[in-house]
């Protein structure tokens, strides 16, 4: 069991006094994540801007755990909470999107993906329409190479601005990001703060039509009005996660208040009172049943984090990787 956030702040008394952002002890992560489940952050920090974040990183000893989150769309937080600091990049300090030249946009890491799609439409830049259908923020899109409709984040990235654990600035090229399918090999210790995108000129009517198609498709096949974290598992090579989940009889499967959506069975939803334990147990049950049915091991796309409640544990399904 972790100590209180107040106790942690007391240990750092004076070191954080110059910060302009907001420090909040013992804040429920269920207020932040789209699943609306999970235990508290020991201390939540919302920096005002990159300079404030840098000052915070320089002040906090490296042995204290630190987790950075964006808008909380693909996070499953365990019920025992998250020790140390959870840093949430705010829309005010990190959510702007601006056109910097004819073919380039700069976006803060907390900008919703949809905002980037809208800015690209206004600028007449094509091939950002896929962001219109991704329920997340740009920081997460950079970290996991988010994509849809045959387009991926890596195709648009010029450079990414980031801070390391010591608060020092780094600028990473597209190659530095080490992109692969739903993955970046950039150091997990780097905190992305903004990105420079490159687009190609397009007709606004065509871009708007593509965005409308993305939105229509999403509303037709995904549970967009439910409490969900988006796609639960990555697509295995040569097939789709939802197909394997469906073939294993897991469409609509429930554990407590957690359910695999009837509409799209690779989406896990909180039907009202799910705990983090319910959600993770459901996910591991699905992985086991899919492996038993098809020999395919599904890999989580949703990020799981935090501590189990005292006395709780989930044995991760360890199927053979093929």
Curated annotation (Swiss-Prot):
UniProt keyword list: Cell cycle, Cell division, Cell shape, Cell wall biogenesis/degradation, Cytoplasm, FAD, Flavoprotein, NADP, Oxidoreductase, Peptidoglycan synthesis
Pathway of action: Cell wall biogenesis; peptidoglycan biosynthesis
GO MF term set: FAD binding; UDP-N-acetylmuramate dehydrogenase activity
Record's keyword annotation contains Oxidoreductase: yes
EC number: 1.3.1.98
Coiled coil, from the record: none
Keyword NADP attributed: yes
Organism per entry: Brucella canis (strain ATCC 23365 / NCTC 10854 / RM-666)
Its job: Cell wall formation.
Residue spans crossing the bilayer: none
Name of this protein: UDP-N-acetylenolpyruvoylglucosamine reductase
GO cellular component, one term: cytosol
Record-linked NCBIfam families: murB, PRK13905.1
Signal peptide: none
Primary location class: cytoplasm
Top-level EC class as recorded in UniProt: oxidoreductase
């Amino acid at each position: 069991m972790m100590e209180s956030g107040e106790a942690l702040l007391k240990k750092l008394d004076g070191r954080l006094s110059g910060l302009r952002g907001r420090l909040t002890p013992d804040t429920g992560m269920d207020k932040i994540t789209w699943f609306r489940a999970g235990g508290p952050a020991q201390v939540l920090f919302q920096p005002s801007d990159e300079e404030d974040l840098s000052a915070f990183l320089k002040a906090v000893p490296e042995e204290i755990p630190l987790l950075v989150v964006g808008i909380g769309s693909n996070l499953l937080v365990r019920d025992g909470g998250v020790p140390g600091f959870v840093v949430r990049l705010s829309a005010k300090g990190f959510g702007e999107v601006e056109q910097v030249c004819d073919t380039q946009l700069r976006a803060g890491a907390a900008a919703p993906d949809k905002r980037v799609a809208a800015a690209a439409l206004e600028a007449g830049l094509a091939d950002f329409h896929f962001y219109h259908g991704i329920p997340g923020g740009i920081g997460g899109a950079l970290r996991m190479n988010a994509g849809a409709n045959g387009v991926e984040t890596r195709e648009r990235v010029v450079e990414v601005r980031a801070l390391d654990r010591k608060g020092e600035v780094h600028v990473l090229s597209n190659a530095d990001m080490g992109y692969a399918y739903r993955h970046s090999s950039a150091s997990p210790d780097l905190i992305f703060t903004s990105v420079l995108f490159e687009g190609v000129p397009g007709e606004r009517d065509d871009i708007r039509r593509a965005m409308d198609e993305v939105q229509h498709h999403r509303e037709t096949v995904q549970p967009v009005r439910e409490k969900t974290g988006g796609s639960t598992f990555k697509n295995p090579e040569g097939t789709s996660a939802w197909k394997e989940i469906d073939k294993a009889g897991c469409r609509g499967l429930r554990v407590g208040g957690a359910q695999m959506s009837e509409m799209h069975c690779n989406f896990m939803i909180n039907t009202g009172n799910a705990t983090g334990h319910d959600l993770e147990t459901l996910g591991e049950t699905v992985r086991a049943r899919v492996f038993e049915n098809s020999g395919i091991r599904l890999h989580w796309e949703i990020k799981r984090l935090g501590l189990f409640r005292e006395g709780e544990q989930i044995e991760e399904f360890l199927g053979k990787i093929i």
